[in-house]
Amino acid sequence: MHMKTYLFVFLLFISLISKGQDSLDDLLGSTSSTNKPISTTFSSTRIVTGHSVEMIPKGVGEFRISHRFGTIEEGFYDIFGLDQAKIRLGYDYGITDNIMVGFGRNSHRKVYDIFAKFSFLNQTIDNSTPITLQYLFASSMETLRYGIKIPFMQRFAQINQVLVAKKINNLSLQIMPSLMIHEYDSYDNNIFTGIGGAIRYLVGKRVAINLE
């Protein structure tokens, strides 16, 4: 599998989605009030570190600073993992209400990444559409210098995720079947599958418990 093939398929997919977006927006705009999508399945476009089904509105940009702390076993010596923190700086943008893109840079292994997220179904107030369904594509490139030469293509990775979410009163549930591809040489198994899950429970107007 080669990076050029994935890039071609990805660009073709964006083109097809963009052409159909105006018609989709017209249909969504013509629905009744009870058919409108529900709001705030999750509090943000991210749950903890992974993507939620929330989207940035059309024409809106968002600069994000994300932290992932280390382990707490060293206690006060490294301030319970604070000294080991990894930081990602990123920018997200809403092309339409149903298409969102972004890019960023992570201090861990000096990784640069891009992503695109597409919304196909939105859970409605009257539950005529019972779930929210989205597709996420992300690609990353590691730029950390090693003592040995690493082939350029082996620095890339891609992930494909289907995001399926359901909001029931104060409880939100999401599952994320995933396919990850590392560009190792052809003798290695470079395709991995998995499934993730997330829960959000609203305990107050501005307080929620998130698990991922």
Task: Describe the role of every protein-language-model region.
Residues 4-10:
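Sec-dependent signal peptide recognition
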Residues 11-13, 47:
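Short linear sequence elements within intrinsically disordered, low-complexity coil regions
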Residues 15-17:
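N-terminal signal peptide c-region/cleavage motif recognized by signal peptidases
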Residues 21-148, 155-160, 166-173, 180-181, ...:
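Transmembrane beta-barrel domains of Gram-negative outer membranes and organellar outer membranes
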Residues 153-155, 189-190:
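Active-site glycine- and acidic-residue-rich loops that bind
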Residues 183-195:
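Short helix-loop boundary/capping segments
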Residues 196-200:
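Generic long, charged, amphipathic alpha-helical segments
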